[in-house]
Amino acid sequence: SGNSFGDYIPYRTWKPTIVVGGEVLKPTSWHFAHEQWGGNQMQSRFLKNSKRLMTNIDYNSWVGVRIFGDAITRSKSLDSKEILTQIMDEKFNVAAYKGKPVSFRKWNGQLRQPILLVTPRALVSVSPQIGFVHPKTELDTLGIDESDTKCKFN
């Protein structure tokens, strides 16, 4: 594909078919090509301070610190039990530059977040995909739902 359209064509056609020389699509929490919902500003600030592109490990670390910072601020406490109670509260969420606030699944403690679908050089889409509905939050269309698992957070 000569790096000119292999990132885009396979995933943006009416009827997807094999494209020789195309790129591999993979899910990730962050990618340097993500620019929506303030992502470009976050990328720019990170690049200015660190002299490199942000990776998903950098992003996940930032989200973790942001979650604890917000939980401490909202609970007005440094007690670990109060912080955890705040984080696991159904109303707790954090803006994370992905268009939808991230939150935790109460039943298994998993972080609910939009997932970026990327090639090595391009953002193709952000999941959950349009049309998938859930009675509680469309972010629960990603992963295993509460009714489909015996896993419980203790």
Cite the ranges covered by each PLM segment:
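Extracytosolic ligand-binding ectodomains
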Residues: 1-154
